[in-house]
A protein has these predicted regions:
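RNA pseudouridine synthases
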Residues: 1-181, 187, 288-292
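Flexible glycine-rich active-site/ligand-binding loops centered on an Asp-His dyad
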Residues: 164, 168-172, 239-254
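Short, surface-exposed secondary-structure edge patches
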Residues: 50-54, 222, 260
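Short Pro/Gly-enriched beta-strand edge/turn motifs at strand-loop
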Residues: 65-66, 190-193, 204, 248-254
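The conserved catalytic core of RNA pseudouridine synthases
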Residues: 124-155, 164, 168, 184-240, ...
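RNA substrate-recognition surfaces in RNA-acting enzymes
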Residues: 245-279
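Short, P/G- and charge-enriched loop/turn segments at secondary-structure junctions
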Residues: 80-81, 193-199, 253-257
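Conserved hydrophobic positions within beta-strands
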Residues: 84, 171, 208-211, 244
Length: 294
């Protein structure tokens, strides 16, 4: 169990414990609300206190980040291990293979999922907290927090300079101009619960792109989402007239070329929210995407 501590500064004299927890330790309102009723979860100088207690310079406020009730249906000792790129006390960076869903389907709990793999790895009673999601067909890097606190901190950092993500994609045709920003709102397509499209009444959606390599049939791109809409990168490339290779929903499916949309979460930069360490990871482009460029 992760325990956070903070020594009260002179300028924090006279504040309430909840002010220290919300301000200096950056607990979300929801997390603080759940913790304040748990026995010995919040301590002042080693003693359990109410969150309205007044602090003084030199006092030590600590909080134990106990977890919510785990899902028993996710735990299985024989689940395949996830591909772990990095792990510390607070989080993991995973390299998700294409074809593995983030969570099990309600009607097929036995199907492989990243949540089940991670729960099996961490052990019974663990609760995986994915900071972002990748479509089943998308491969690459993502972060899983080990506590709701770290999850909240990283979710707040999404699409800011504190947490940046870049993708590699192979699009059909030769994309021009060689770089730019796609600024086109995205919303749900009429008559579909899955498909998205560019539409005037959609949500603000921005994607930065850069051409890295071209062949006669395909273009390798660097994509950086500035927002996080469902299927954003796939929709924006289709909007440009260059859908991703293998994208059955927004382009043309050809399993002889590639059996999934050619999209890979390639690079991550973020600040570890507890230690303050700057983190940077890359995951090589998978072979099924590399073959398209040969």
């Amino acid at each position: 169990m992760r325990i956070l501590t903070h020594t009260v500064l002179p300028e924090e004299e006279g504040r309430m414990v909840k002010g220290i927890l919300r301000g200096s330790l950056q607990l979300s309102y929801t997390l603080l609300k759940s913790l304040k009723w748990r026995e010995n979860a919040i301590l002042l100088n080693g003693q359990s206190v109410h969150v309205n207690a007044i602090v003084h310079a030199g006092d030590v406020v600590s909080v134990a980040l106990s977890e919510r009730t785990p899902r028993e249906d996710l735990y299985c000792e024989n689940t395949a291990a996830p591909n772990i790129v990095y792990e510390d006390e607070d989080l993991l960076v995973l390299n998700k293979p294409a074809g593995v869903a983030m969570h099990p389907k309600a009607d097929d709990a036995a199907a492989p999922s990243l949540a089940a793999m991670l729960t099996g790895y961490l052990g019974e009673g663990s609760v995986p907290h994915f900071v972002s999601r990748l479509d089943k067909g998308t491969s690459g890097l993502l972060i899983a927090a080990k506590s709701g606190y770290v999850h909240d901190r990283l979710r707040r950092a999404l699409h800011s300079s504190e947490l940046r993500r870049e993708y590699r994609a192979v699009a059909v045709g030769q994309v021009t101009p060689p770089c730019g920003v796609i600024d086109a709102p995205i919303g749900r397509a009429d008559g579909s619960i899955v498909r998205r499209c560019v539409r005037e009444d959609g949500l603000v959606s921005r994607t930065e792109y850069e051409v890295l390599q071209t062949t006669e049939r395909f273009t390798l791109l660097r994509l950086r989402p500035e927002t996080g809409r469902t299927h954003q990168l796939r929709v924006h490339m289709a909007y440009l007239g260059h859908p991703l290779a293998g994208d059955w929903l927004y382009g043309t499916e050809d399993k002889n070329l590639i059996a999934r949309p050619a999209l890979h979460s390639y690079e991550l930069w973020f600040t570890q929210p507890v230690t303050g360490q700057e983190m940077h990871f890359t995951a090589p482009i998978p072979q099924d995407m590399q073959r398209l460029l040969e």
